[in-house]
Amino acid sequence: MTAEAPPDDDIIEPEMLLRAYATGIFPMAEEADDPEVFWVRPEKRGVIPLDGFHIPRSLQKTIRQGIFKIRLDSNFAGVIEGCASGTGERARTWINEPIRRAYAKLFEIGHCHTVEAWYEGKLAGGLYGVTLGRAFFGESMFTRKRDASKVCLAYLVQHLSRQGFVLLDTQFTTPHLERFGALEVPRKEYEEMLERALEGIARF
C-alpha cells in the first residue's frame, strides 16, 4: 500500500480526485476527527465481478418481500452521514470533513452517486461511490435496519450491469463482501481492468 498526504489536507478538488481514481488511487483518513487525508494504492484490490455476484438465499427472500423502497441520489447528505457515523459494529470510521466535502463536490457534478434503502419513510441504509467511465468505485455503506445495505448492494450490481458498467471496485475485500463474490486481484491486473473500464462511458 502506498500512502502520502495531498498538497493541502483541507482541499481535494474534484479534478484532482478523478485523476487519482483514473490511476487507481483513492483518499482515506485515519479516523473521522483526523483532519489529514492520505492517498492509497493497494498492492491487491477488491472487486466484485458483475457477472459473478452471489446473493445469499436469506437476502433473496428479503428482496422478494419488497421491505425496502430503493432510491438513487435522493439523499446524499444522509447517506454520507450514515457512513461516517460509528455504529456498534463499526466504532471508527475513516470519513473525515475534507473527504465529506470532496465527495459532496463530486456529487454536485454527477460523479458520485448513492443507492438508498428507505423503510417507512426513513433512510434505513445505503451506499455511495464514484463513477468514472464504466467503473463504479464503492466507497462506503451503512445500515440502520437489518439487510438494508445488502439490498442496496444487490440493487447496485443489477443497476450497474443494466447501465453498461464493467467494473465494481470495492477497494479492499472483507469476509462480508466475499459472501457476495468479492475477490482480490493484484495491482497490475486491477490496473488493466481499470484501463478497459475507462475506455467507454456509462451513465449511472
Curated annotation (Swiss-Prot):
Tell me the InterPro entries matching this sequence. Acyl_CoA_acyltransferase (IPR016181), Leu/Phe-tRNA_Trfase (IPR004616), Leu/Phe-tRNA_Trfase_C (IPR042203), Leu/Phe-tRNA_Trfase_N (IPR042221)
Organism's domain of life?
Bacteria
* One GO CC term, this protein: cytoplasm
Q: Which reaction does it catalyse?
A: N-terminal L-lysyl-[protein] + L-leucyl-tRNA(Leu) = N-terminal L-leucyl-L-lysyl-[protein] + tRNA(Leu) + H(+); N-terminal L-arginyl-[protein] + L-leucyl-tRNA(Leu) = N-terminal L-leucyl-L-arginyl-[protein] + tRNA(Leu) + H(+); L-phenylalanyl-tRNA(Phe) + an N-terminal L-alpha-aminoacyl-[protein] = an N-terminal L-phenylalanyl-L-alpha-aminoacyl-[protein] + tRNA(Phe)
Could you state one GO biological process linked to this protein?
A: protein catabolic process
Q: Where in the cell is it found?
A: Cytoplasm
Key words, A-Z:
Acyltransferase, Cytoplasm, Transferase
List the Gene Ontology MF annotations in alphabetical order. leucyl-tRNA--protein transferase activity
The EC designation for this entry is: 2.3.2.6
Family to which the UniProt record says this protein belongs: Belongs to the L/F-transferase family.
What HAMAP family does the annotation carry? Leu_Phe_trans
What the protein does comes down to:
Functions in the N-end rule pathway of protein degradation where it conjugates Leu, Phe and, less efficiently, Met from aminoacyl-tRNAs to the N-termini of proteins containing an N-terminal arginine or lysine.
Name assigned to this protein: Leucyl/phenylalanyl-tRNA--protein transferase
The upper taxonomy is: Bacteria, Pseudomonadati, Pseudomonadota, Alphaproteobacteria, Hyphomicrobiales
